[in-house]
Amino acid sequence: MNWITNYVRPRINSMLGRREVPENLWIKCPETGEMVFHKDLEGNKWVIPASGYHMKMPAKARLADLFDNGEFESLPQPKVAQDPLKFRDSKKYSDRLRDSRLKTEQEDTILAGVGKVQGLKLVAVVHEFNFIGGSLGMAAGEAIVKAFERATAEKCPLVMFPASGGARMQEGILSLMQLPRTTVAVDMLKESGQPYIVVLTNPTTGGVTASYAMLGDIHLAEPGAEIGFAGKRVIEQTLREKLPEGFQTAEYLLEHGMVDMVVKRHDIPETLARLLKILTKKPVSAANDMNGGAIALAASA
């Protein structure tokens, strides 16, 4: 009886039992509830095919999608002090860093690279929202400063893709110090005569909005992106008033003159190339000029 219980039954159960399905195999659209297979979503640049809803795009995928043929030089992550305040809330900050690194396979929030977009050399800086909410800490601030220094040295434009909840509270004042540091870095690039374009993605809030995210020469935004300083709920509780429909969305900000264009994710590389070639006085092909004009009209409609 023992051999049946101990050997045969487990073998049968293992063959007939339910298999574990990865949690991220199917992705649900927040707007329509439609379920999309993860491979189909990745193939469509993390945009829901039917509704057009723009999901959060991983930083590595965004860099690969932006640059020609997905080829670029990754900028190294600067070394900074780890958990200098020995911060702990419900969990040790050092444990949060470890878990986020395992989850994203990144050292910190920021990924930066140098490459070409339609033949035009530029530096791109991308936030990874899945790394502690894309928050700005010492490591992220240092990486951003180094990216601006590289763009200044290379005499090329810089494009920023923020996606952040703001300053990283676990680093306290050391995090807040990154706001003026990154602002100075932006000024350094502008003084060199190079363009700085910001592509606002969902969400862009808090201290990031209060610093480098709103200092671009031109501001683009992805459809439906939430952009603001404080959250809608906090503002309503403070003012004790109901806010307008669509408040803090990319479309609302476009209507009120806070962003220049709302651009679909598939059109971002072409739009950036066209704008940067104009700003750097490089020749723009007639085909690109026509397509870019169509995008601009669609965005402002």
From Swiss-Prot:
Name of the molecule in the record: Acetyl-coenzyme A carboxylase carboxyl transferase subunit beta
Q: Mind telling me which GO cellular component terms the entry cites?
A: acetate CoA-transferase complex
Q: What class of enzyme is it?
A: transferase
> What job does this protein perform?
Component of the acetyl coenzyme A carboxylase (ACC) complex. Biotin carboxylase (BC) catalyzes the carboxylation of biotin on its carrier protein (BCCP) and then the CO(2) group is transferred by the transcarboxylase to acetyl-CoA to form malonyl-CoA.
Task: Give GO terms for biological process.
Answer: fatty acid biosynthetic process; malonyl-CoA biosynthetic process
The record, for PANTHER family, names: ACETYL-COENZYME A CARBOXYLASE CARBOXYL TRANSFERASE SUBUNIT BETA, CHLOROPLASTIC (PTHR42995:SF5)
Report whether Lipid metabolism shows up as a keyword of the record: yes
Q: Which InterPro entries match?
A: AcCoA_carboxyl_beta, Acetyl_CoA_COase_Trfase_b_su, ClpP/crotonase-like_dom_sf, COA_CT_N
The record's EC number reads 2.1.3.15
Q: Where is the CoA carboxyltransferase N-terminal domain?
A: 25-294
Q: Where in the cell is it found?
A: Cytoplasm
Q: Which UniProt keywords apply?
A: ATP-binding, Cytoplasm, Fatty acid biosynthesis, Fatty acid metabolism, Lipid biosynthesis, Lipid metabolism, Nucleotide-binding, Transferase
| Similarity comment text for this entry | Belongs to the AccD/PCCB family.
Give the source's domain of life in one word: Bacteria
> What binding partners and quaternary form does the record give?
Acetyl-CoA carboxylase is a heterohexamer composed of biotin carboxyl carrier protein (AccB), biotin carboxylase (AccC) and two subunits each of ACCase subunit alpha (AccA) and ACCase subunit beta (AccD).
Which SUPFAM superfamilies does the record cross-reference, listed alphabetically? ClpP/crotonase
Question: Which pathway, per its entry?
Answer: Lipid metabolism; malonyl-CoA biosynthesis; malonyl-CoA from acetyl-CoA: step 1/1
Pfam families this protein is in?
Carboxyl_trans (PF01039)
Give the reaction(s) catalysed. Answer: N(6)-carboxybiotinyl-L-lysyl-[protein] + acetyl-CoA = N(6)-biotinyl-L-lysyl-[protein] + malonyl-CoA
Disulfide partners: none
Molecular function (GO) terms for this protein are: acetyl-CoA carboxylase activity; ATP binding; carboxyl- or carbamoyltransferase activity
